[in-house]
UniProtKB/Swiss-Prot annotation:
GO terms for molecular function: ribosome binding; rRNA binding; translation initiation factor activity. Gene3D superfamilies: Nucleic acid-binding proteins. Its main location: cytoplasm. It comes from Photorhabdus laumondii subsp. laumondii (strain DSM 15139 / CIP 105565 / TT01). It comes from the Bacteria. Keywords: Cytoplasm, Initiation factor, Protein biosynthesis, RNA-binding, rRNA-binding. The keyword Membrane does not apply. Residues 1-72 form the S1-like domain. This is Translation initiation factor IF-1.
Length: 72
């Protein structure tokens, strides 16, 4: 799948789940389950409840996503 097929949205981390999964509320009000991207995991970027994040969603399953950026 090409990278431009993904949908990027802003959201807030609501809850931390096991296995580096997070429950994220998007700007439009939807709640999705998201995991950390490989580069964030490699660089030990910590994500806490309440952080503003950028989530990449695939058009095939809009209930799951990947956290690609944590805002300060």
């Amino acid at each position: 799948m090409a990278k431009e097929d993904n949908i990027e949205m802003q959201g807030t981390v609501l809850d931390t789940l096991p296995n580096t999964m997070f429950r994220v509320e998007l700007e439009n009000g939807h709640v999705v389950t998201a995991h950390i991207s490989g580069k964030m995991r490699k660089n030990y970027i910590r994500i806490l409840t309440g952080d503003k994040v950028t989530v990449e969603l695939t058009p095939y399953d809009l209930s799951k996503g990947r956290i690609v950026f944590r805002s300060r």
